Amino acid sequence: ILEHGGADFVLHLAGYYDFTNEDNEEYQRTNVQGTRNILKLAKQIGTRRFLFASSLAACKFPARGKTIDESSPPVAQYPYAISKRAGEELIKEHQEWFPSAIVRMAAIYSDWCEYPPLYVFINTWTASKWNSRVLGGRGHSAVPYLHVQDLIRFFLKVIEKTDSLPRLCTLNASPNGFTTHIELYKTATRYFFGRDVRSLLMLRFLVVP
């Protein structure tokens, strides 16, 4: 890379995540040690700004009526969130090396639905199975979704505006809001079946032991 003039920007997207909520050595090896390795590489090639892909999931779910913003601390207490917090701390520890941007991303999906939970939801709701109409609780649980093309535009804008950004900044790559599961259910089933399909809301005591 140095032989070809170095690199103005380093975009660190690599990371490990699974849906078990259990600890895994890859969180430390990939998300923490891997970030440390990329930071050292970025210093060697003289980057103008380091862009670190963190996640809104590093922050605790906000209370009703509250939102997550750029000042929200990354204090969620499950393995993936803890590893992202450690990554953010590494960025802060190395800020004297080069300017950096911590980008906390929403749930990223594509036209191919390459976000596993979203795929499972839509695949279930559009199938002819006993549970295809079931939603947990009142369907008010929600996730902020962002299309991968919008994420690309976001990163390009950060690069374009790099000289006007603080040396170290935290940015949320997310819509200004969220999509509830009941909203998602209604949209997906109406589009697929061409009509409204009534959902079945599962009571809390049937879900929580």
Task: Name every feature range the model reports, one short phrase each.
Residues 1-30, 41, 59:
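NAD(P)H-binding glycine-rich loop region in Rossmannoid oxidoreductase-like domains
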Residues 9, 34-37, 49, 72, ...:
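Conserved cofactor-binding/catalytic machinery of classical short-chain dehydrogenase/reductase
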Residues 10-14, 50-56, 103-105:
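SDR active-site strand-loop-helix element
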Residues 15-17, 56-60, 74, 106-109:
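Active-site segment of SDR-like NAD(P)-dependent oxidoreductases
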Residues 29, 33, 64-109, 113:
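Catalytic helix-loop patch of NAD(P)-dependent Rossmann-fold dehydrogenases
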Residues 36-79:
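Conserved Rossmann-fold NAD(P)-dependent oxidoreductase catalytic core, especially the SDR/UDP-sugar
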Residues 95-143, 148, 157:
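NAD(P)-dependent short-chain dehydrogenase/reductase
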Residues 154-209:
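Mid/C-terminal beta-alpha module of Rossmann-like enzyme folds, strongest
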